Curated annotation (Swiss-Prot):
Coiled coil: none annotated. Its main location: secreted. Transmembrane segments: none annotated. The keyword Cytoplasm does not apply. This is Hrp pili protein HrpA. Analysis of mutants revealed that the C-terminus is important for pilus assembly and secretion and / or regulation function of HprA. The gene is hrpA. Keywords: Fimbrium, Secreted, Virulence. It is found in: Secreted; Fimbrium. Induction: Expression enhanced by contact with host cell wall. Also regulated by HrpRS and HrpL. Belongs to the HrpA type 1 family. One of its GO terms (cellular component) is extracellular space. It comes from Pseudomonas syringae pv. tomato (strain ATCC BAA-871 / DC3000).
Length: 113
């Protein structure tokens, strides 16, 4: 029963981590979008020039890179969470196997011929 409670606790913590990770990723996306809008508005107010165009291009590339990094981080977080759940399941199975072996050994001690 203790192993089940521990597994339940691990799964609950994992779920909370998933919600926090996705929330953080979404917040990052909103920050990138907000920065892009701000840069666009600043650039629109400065007029046309090669340096303004270069800055706009650099900002766009930087925002695209930031979005890729956020997506990569979210993907890796999901992979880690999956591995954590699989490890918790495996640990529960190993615990059950160890208990069965121990009980069999204890019962065998009482057998005499």
């Amino acid at each position: 029963m203790v192993a089940f409670a521990g597994l339940t606790s691990k799964l609950t913590n994992l779920g909370n981590s998933a919600v926090g990770g996705v929330g953080g990723a979404l917040q990052g996306v909103n920050t990138v979008a907000s920065n892009a809008t701000l840069q666009k508005n600043i650039l629109l107010g400065t007029g046309d020039s090669l340096s303004v165009d270069a800055q706009a291009k650099a900002s766009k590339e930087s925002d695209a890179n930031g979005a890729k990094l956020i997506a990569m981080q979210a993907q890796e977080t999901m992979k880690k969470q999956t591995m954590d759940v699989l490890n918790a399941i495996q640990a529960g199975k190993e615990d059950s196997t160890n208990k069965k072996i121990s009980a069999t050994a204890t019962n065998a001690k009482g057998i005499s011929y």
